[in-house]
From Swiss-Prot:
It comes from Escherichia coli (strain K12). Keywords: Amino-acid biosynthesis, Cell inner membrane, Cell membrane, Cysteine biosynthesis, Membrane, Sulfate transport, Transmembrane, Transmembrane helix, Transport. GO terms for cellular component: plasma membrane. Its main location: membrane. High affinity, high specificity proton-dependent sulfate transporter, which mediates sulfate uptake. Provides the sulfur source for the cysteine synthesis pathway. Does not transport thiosulfate. The gene is cysZ. Belongs to the CysZ family. This is Sulfate transporter CysZ. Inhibited by sulfite. It is a multi-pass membrane protein.
Length: 253
């Protein structure tokens, strides 16, 4: 099936919505099952545990609020909850993506072939197994780029005043960009585009990618919906690749 997508610029919101449509297409659903199972098991268990701990963590986080900001505690408390959800959600979605990376790459490859009519390289379970070391190396590159920046932002949470006001906003923007990188990287990596070159390409459409990443980040925090977000985001990012980046970076056509 040749894609009905056009090369006209679209918003990140559009591609996120496309992900929900594409994930259930005939011929694609079977490639969704394994990433979906990984996400349901890990994110479901993780968020269940998180909600049993919030009544301990939130008061601890609020204890860093200085006395002169106590009058804003009714506004800062929701920000503290959102902060915990953002950090926790991104952390566990990163773990889930590490585990499911080979299957996410296969999903992106098969969806791209369906959208464009192109013939992908010969794949299958043996092809996936052979590619696992390269895929894990790529995941490590993303993690090594992300970790020092995340540590700096996490330190901000322990600075009175800043940690309860500015830090949550900065973390949300950072997680939006990182999730755009995480999911857009699957189709890029399928075409062996280097990690640095991929980031440069995404910056040419930074607003679109920030919109896509922001919605992905928000849905990662919502119980039940976050169980399905991984394959949806892979499909949305692949649709964006087909429209915006494939003509310049594709290795197979």
């Amino acid at each position: 099936m040749v894609s009905s997508f056009t090369s006209a610029p679209r918003s990140g919101f559009y591609y996120f919505a496309q992900g929900w449509k594409l994930v259930s297409q005939p011929g694609i659903r079977r490639f969704v099952i394994l990433p979906l199972l990984v996400n349901i098991l890990l994110m479901g268990g993780a968020f269940w545990w998180l909600f049993t701990q919030l009544d301990v963590w939130i008061p601890t986080l609020m204890s860093y609020v200085p006395d002169w900001l106590q009058w804003l505690s009714y506004l800062l408390w929701p920000l503290a909850v959102i902060s915990v959800l953002l950090v926790f959600g991104y952390f566990f979605s990163t773990i889930a993506n590490w585990i499911a990376a080979p299957f996410n790459g296969l999903l992106a490859e098969q969806l791209e072939a369906r959208l464009t009519g192109a013939t992908p390289p010969d794949t299958g379970i043996f092809g996936i197994m052979k590619d696992v070391p390269r895929i894990m190396k790529r995941e490590w590159q993303k993690f090594a780029w992300y970790l020092p920046r995340a540590i700096v932002l996490l330190i901000l949470y322990f600075i009175p005043g800043i940690g309860q006001t500015v830090a949550p906003v900065l973390w949300f923007l950072f997680s939006a960009w990182m999730l755009a990188i995480q999911y857009c990287d699957y189709p890029f990596d399928n075409h062996k585009v280097p990690f640095k070159e991929m980031r440069t390409a995404l910056r040419t459409r930074k607003i679109t990618n920030m919109q896509f990443g922001a919605l992905t980040s928000l849905f990662t925090m919502i119980p039940l919906l976050n169980l399905f977000i991984m394959p949806v985001a892979v499909c949305g990012a692949t649709a964006m690749w087909v429209d915006c980046y494939r003509d310049k970076h594709a290795m197979w056509r």
